[in-house]
């Protein structure tokens, strides 16, 4: 079985589309269970891979089916579609409720679960500021979000696993606690970088620990509770 070395933007769903192998077959492969999801990597989400991750791609299995002679038979390969979830927050990290927006996937306007099923009407976020795009093609590369005169470009699948330093940095960036130019590969920032430590402290103060009773835990170091809270946000 061939091994694919992940690059920035790779997901199991994208690999499944390219290799014509169901994503569940790839993710559940014994080698990926032991080396990718276990070992030192401990990847927990098939849509979050780090460049350099080794992914075992199983060979296709031949399947036989019967059909009557002198008849026309149709065999349809089911598409594996994904879901893109976004959440809009204001400067105080409060959700943008019922905000009008348009979203485009690779330049094409798409409907969302929070709005109309057609693409001619502007949709709105829900009560938690959330946007959900269903039936997303696995190979989709970029989302363009327009709201309140702003346009935001998002590279789909580029967020690194939360278990990695770059995954922590990316989430702090998305939440507005840290600013760095995201490149390919994602920039390496030392965990002792003063700005990064300050960003982690700010996040811990707001979401993880009580500044009045747990001030000693607000260290700027990404502990397990901080990592879990970042993942939830």
What is the predicted role of each segment?
Residues 1-22, 79-82, 163-177, 183-198, ...:
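Primarily a LysM-type cell-wall glycan-binding module
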Residues 7, 108-130, 179:
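Short, acidic Ser/Thr/Gly-rich low-complexity loop/linker segments typical of extracellular
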Residues 7-47, 104-108, 178-179, 192-210:
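LysM (lysin motif) carbohydrate-binding repeats in extracellular/periplasmic proteins that recognize
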Residues 17-20, 126-142:
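Short Pro-Gly-centered beta-turn/loop motif in secreted/extracellular proteins
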Residues 21, 93-112:
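Short, ordered, surface-exposed loop/turn motifs in non-cytosolic proteins
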Residues 22-72, 206-233:
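Extracellular LysM carbohydrate-binding repeats and other cell-envelope/extracellular binding modules
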Residues 82-92:
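A short, amphipathic beta-strand motif
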Residues 90-93, 133-194:
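Acidic, Ser/Thr/Pro/Gly-enriched interdomain connector segments
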């Amino acid at each position: 079985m061939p091994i694919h070395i992940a690059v920035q933007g790779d997901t199991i769903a994208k690999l499944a589309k390219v290799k014509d192998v169901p994503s569940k077959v790839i993710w559940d492969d014994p080698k990926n269970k032991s080396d990718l999801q276990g070992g030192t990597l401990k990847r927990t989400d098939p849509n979050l891979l780090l460049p350099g991750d080794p992914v075992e791609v199983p060979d296709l299995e031949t399947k036989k089916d019967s059909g009557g002679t002198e008849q026309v038979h149709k065999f349809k390969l089911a598409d594996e579609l994904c879901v893109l979830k976004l959440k809009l927050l204001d400067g105080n990290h409060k959700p943008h409720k019922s905000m009008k927006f348009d979203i485009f996937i690779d330049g094409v306007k798409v409907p969302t679960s929070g709005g109309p099923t057609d693409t001619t009407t502007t949709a709105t976020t829900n009560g938690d500021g959330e946007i959900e795009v269903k039936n997303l093609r696995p190979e989709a590369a970029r989302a363009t979000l327009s709201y309140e005169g702003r346009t935001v470009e998002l590279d789909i699948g580029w967020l690194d696993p939360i278990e990695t330093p770059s995954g922590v940095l990316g989430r702090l960036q998305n939440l507005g606690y840290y600013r760095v130019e995201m490149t390919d590969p994602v920039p390496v920032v030392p965990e002792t970088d003063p700005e990064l430590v300050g960003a982690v402290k700010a996040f811990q103060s707001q979401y993880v620990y009580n500044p009045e009773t747990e001030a000693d835990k607000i260290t700027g170091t990404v502990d397990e509770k901080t990592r879990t809270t970042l993942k939830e946000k």
